[in-house]
Amino acid sequence: MQPFVSFSQVGHTYHSEKQSVKVLDNVNFDVSKHEFVAIVGPSGCGKSTLLRVLSGLIEPSEGQVRVFGHPVSGPREDIGIVFQKPTLLPWKNVLDNVLFPLKHKFGHVSDKDRKHAQSLLEKVGLADFTTSMPNELSGGMQQRVGIARALLLNPDILIMDEPFSALDALTREEMGFELQRIWMEKPKTVLFITHSISEAVLLADKVLVMGPRPSTVLEEIQINLPRPRTINTLQEKTFSDYTTKIREYFYRPAVMETTASADKDNVAPLRRRA
């Protein structure tokens, strides 16, 4: 069966007047349709670059990325992106922020579009906040708006670049369970970057473990835990075994040495948080 997303020998180097920095080297992995894939690795190893390559925002220096067999050659409309910060427009209310991609693309929105946006806000638990302004919302609520906006055009692929990292621990955990519920109700192919190993194991079907720069995929770990995963899942031995296995990659001598070297080049090492 043809993979939905395929990275084949992907490498990327950033060039500047002072230096060239290779961040990705021979990255290979496949993603099935509707699979939830989490990506963990040291800071500065190129995780976000992977997602920019997939979304067509940058062209890889080496190799190729394909979506359902077709090479990625530029920005794609079938990919939704949720950033670390939701970047809401402060002068627009919640509903208009969700509708902004359609307004920007077509210049107008229909009553059908508004009903669709309202249904998405209901799905993320914000049905009563359509007329609220961003500054009236908590951080978690703002991120829910960002998720609804990313889903507006019904993308085949959802890219999430550390979407919960700016939230407090309790809100972050709540948002993880909320994301799982949304994904289970209407599955998407998800690539999710996180520095939290436990968050990766809790949410993903598969975790990609990346090494220090120039990074490649050290291992693909299938997460065989039943869904829906709950707060009780966090207490299970199998869950603990997965997090321990992943964490050990970042304490191996070779990885520690390379990561420390990267830190001297102003690249922060992995923030080792479970």
Model regions and ranges:
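Conserved ABC ATPase "signature" region
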Residues: 110-129, 181
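Hydrophobic anchor residue at the start of the ABC signature
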Residues: 147
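Helix-to-loop junction immediately C-terminal to a conserved catalytic motif
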Residues: 55
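The feature captures the beta-strand-to-loop junction immediately N-terminal to the Walker
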Residues: 40-42
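Conserved signature/switch motifs of ABC ATPase nucleotide-binding domains
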Residues: 132-135, 153
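Catalytic Walker B motif of ABC-type/P-loop ATPase nucleotide-binding domains
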Residues: 158-161
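ABC-type ATPase nucleotide-binding domains, specifically the catalytic core motifs of the NBD
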Residues: 15-17, 59, 92, 99-112, ...
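Conserved ABC transporter NBD signature motif
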Residues: 63-75
